[in-house]
Curated annotation (Swiss-Prot):
CDD domains: NMNAT_Eukarya
GO molecular function: ATP binding; nicotinamide-nucleotide adenylyltransferase activity; nicotinate-nucleotide adenylyltransferase activity; unfolded protein binding
NCBIfam families (UniProt xref): nicotinate (nicotinamide) nucleotide adenylyltransferase
Coiled coil regions, renumbered to chain: none
Impact upon substituting residue 380 to R: Switches localization from nuclear to cytoplasmic
Species name: Drosophila melanogaster (Fruit fly)
Protein name: Nicotinamide-nucleotide adenylyltransferase
Similarity-based family: Belongs to the eukaryotic NMN adenylyltransferase family.
UniProt GO cellular component terms: cytoplasm; mitochondrion; neuromuscular junction; neuronal cell body; presynaptic active zone
The protein's role, per its UniProt record: Catalyzes the formation of NAD(+) from nicotinamide mononucleotide (NMN) and ATP. Essential for viability. Stress-response chaperone protein that prevents toxic aggregation of proteins and promotes proteasome-mediated degradation of misfolded proteins; this is independent of its NAD(+) synthesis activity. Neuroprotective in response to toxic protein aggregation, for example by overexpressed Atx-1/ataxin-1. Required for maintenance and integrity of mature neurons, protecting them from neuronal activity-induced neurodegeneration.
Residue interval(s) of motif Nuclear localization signal: 380-383
InterPro entries attached to this UniProt entry: Cyt_trans-like, Euk_NMN_adenylyltrnsfrase, NadD/NMNAT, NMNAT_euk, Rossmann-like_a/b/a_fold
Keyword check for Nucleotidyltransferase: yes
One BP annotation, GO: NAD biosynthetic process via the salvage pathway
Name of encoding gene: Nmnat
Amino acid sequence: MIVKISWPKNNITSECFRRFGSFKRRSKSKKMSAFIEETKSLLPRIAFIACGCFSPPTPMHLRMFEIAKDHFEMQGTHRVVGGIISPTHDSYGKKGLASALDRCAMVKLATQSSNWIRLSDWEVHQNQWMRTQAVLQHHQNYINNHINSGGGGGDDGENTHLPGWLPRGLHDSRDPVHLKLLCGADLLESFAVPGLWAEADIEDIVANHGLVVITRAGSNPGKFIFDSDILTKYQSNITLITNWVPNEVSSTLIRRLLGRGQSVKYLLDDLVLEYIKRQRLFNFKSKYITDAVRPNHLLFNHAYTDNNKNANSYSIGDQLEQDMDESDTPSPQLQHTPTSRVFCCGEVPLRGSKVLRSGPGQAVQVITMQADEKEESQAKKQKISQVQL
C-alpha cells in the first residue's frame, strides 16, 4: 500500500523541497531526517535573557531556560539558539545582594554543565544600575551587529574577542535572532505596581522584544495581561508557559537557611554551594568547611570576567535577606566589605586578595573557626605556602 504524505504549503516547506530535489534517490529515513533538520534550520531564531540578582542562582533559574526552550521546540515555531543570564549591578542595593564578582562566579559555576546558557557580566561592569530595557537593547544590538558584520568568516566559538555570552553558530545563517526577556509570573505582576516600572520601558520591552513568562500551575497570569492596556495591546508578543513541575526553592529561602546554619544540600548546585561556603557568603554559619579539595579544573576562579580584561574587582558583601528583583527600580546602595576572606585560585591577580596559580597538588585554604585547631590550621598554611605564587 502506498501512503502519500501531504505537507502543509508554506514558505518553509516549499524551500525545503526546493533544496532537496533529489529526495527520491535517498532512503526514507535519511530523507526524512534531512527534511526535518532543514526545516528546523529555517525556523525563526530566538534567544532568552534573564535579568535579576541571582544571589545565589538556584536550579529553578536554570530550569526556566529549559522549560522555555522545550516549549518553543515542541511548538515547532522557533529555534532557540542561546540563553543569557545577566546579574544586576551592585548599586541595585537589595538586602542579601552578594557582590557582583561573587554572583558572576556562582552563575558561571551553575552553568558549567550547560552548552547553551551563559553568563553576561556586561551589566555589572557598568558605572551604575541599568534599566532592564537598556540591558535588553544592548544585547540585542550586539547580536544584530555580530550577525551583520559576518564575524570575519571564522568560527565564532574560537574568537576570543567575543563576549562569552554570545550564542554560538550565529553565522550559520544571516537570519536575525530575536532576544526575548525570560521571567517568572512575579515580574509580569510587578508591571501593575505603580512607580516600579516606566510605562515607556514596559511598552518597549513587550513590543520590540517580547516576554516569555514561566507561570505556576493554578495561577492566572492572563488576568494581569487583561488588566493592563499595554500588555493587552501586545499580548501576541507574550508567551505564557506553565511549569508543571513546581519548585519553590528561591534565593531568599537559600539565604535564610544558610543564615540559620541549616543545610541547603541538594537545593543548590554543589559547586555553587561550595563556593558559598568558601567565601562565607550570606552569613553562612558552620564550624568547619569540610568539603574535599576538588581537582584543579574545578577550583574557582574568583576573578572571573566575561572576556573583559579591564573588568573591575568586586568584594564580598555581608548583607542578608530579600528576594530577587521584582521591579525595575533600585534600592539605596549598600556598602560592601573591600576585602576577601579566603584564598582563591585563578590566573588574574586581584587587589587585596591572594591568588594561587593553577598547578599540580594545588590546595585551597580550609577555614576553621575553632581556636583549638591552630595546629591543623598552621599545617594547612604551610602546605599552601609551598605552592609557587
